[in-house]
Amino acid sequence: MKTEITWHGHAGFSIKNGISILVDPFFSGNPLAKADAEDVKADLILVTHGHFDHAGDAVKIAKNNQSPIVCSFELSEIIKKEQVETIDTNPGGTIEYKGVRATAVPAIHSSSYFSFHKYLIPISYKIFIFSYTFIILL
């Protein structure tokens, strides 16, 4: 199956490979984003940490798509108050959702609202690493 990756500016990406995965959905107020948060489709949303420029539109998109947000336990406790499904994990933890496996890995970043981590997502023998450096190993 073909994998399609779209950069949404800043740290935001979509990965489509039979399922639509959205990472760090920051659309509103992002001059580099070419889409509006209201129009974004996602089956699964991954948020690396609680800064507005990473978590910005996660709740809005999750509600529009009835999709869960994968994030740290601490951030999950806040997001749940918005009546959105969350899947919490911490560094080293792996979640599985509709055939997608994402593993949270520790990452260093200044002053995050709550803990932060990046995700390894193996898709068809490809590994995608989302961090402040975007690395795709094929």
Question: What is each of the regions a protein language model found here?
Answer:
Residues I15-G18, Y97-K98, I127-F130, L138:
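Active-site beta-strand termini and strand-to-loop segments that position acidic
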